[in-house]
Amino acid sequence: MKKWLCAASLGLALAASASVQAAKIAIVNVSRIFQQLPESETVAKQLENEFKGRATELQGMESDLQTKMQKLQRDGSTMKASDRTKLENDVMKQRETFSTKAQAFEQDNRRRQMEERNKILSRIQDAVKSVASKGGYDVVIDANAVAYADPSKDITADVLKQVK
């Protein structure tokens, strides 16, 4: 009875190990796909146009502020005390306004870039899932996360075709 039980458990163990397959792994270069997509350039130009007015306004404010600061340095010692104080206060207020607007501009610009980038990355992710399921891959790893991979395991071109 013990021999039979031992033989049966050994047979089950061998059968279980035989049915376990190695995971089918692929790699994909997401950053290369992102760079090669025409939408990346389109989005960059769109964002540039979206923030162009505010950037121009900030450049004008900066130029005006620099002019006033130069005037204060150049003529400050010969100005009336009241005029110098008025100009100093004006420069401080304008500097604060500029700083606030510049920070808001940077935050808004960064936020919009992330929104658009995430939209594109979502499309890439969907394409990776589709190509992986069609190819029967169990695991897909970003090419930047591995030191070496067999080029035959690279599905970047297939994903790029799917995204375009």
Swiss-Prot record:
Keywords: Chaperone, Periplasm, Signal. GO terms for cellular component: cytosol; periplasmic space. InterPro entries: Chaperone_Skp (IPR005632), Skp_dom_sf (IPR024930). Residues 1-22 form the signal peptide. One of its GO terms (molecular function) is unfolded protein binding. Disulfide bonds: none annotated. The keyword Iron does not apply. The keyword Signal applies. Residues 101-112 are annotated as: Lipopolysaccharide binding. GO terms for biological process: chaperone-mediated protein folding; protein stabilization. It is found in: Periplasm. Its main location: periplasm. Homotrimer. Belongs to the Skp family. Molecular chaperone that interacts specifically with outer membrane proteins, thus maintaining the solubility of early folding intermediates during passage through the periplasm. This is Chaperone protein Skp. It comes from Yersinia enterocolitica. The gene is skp.
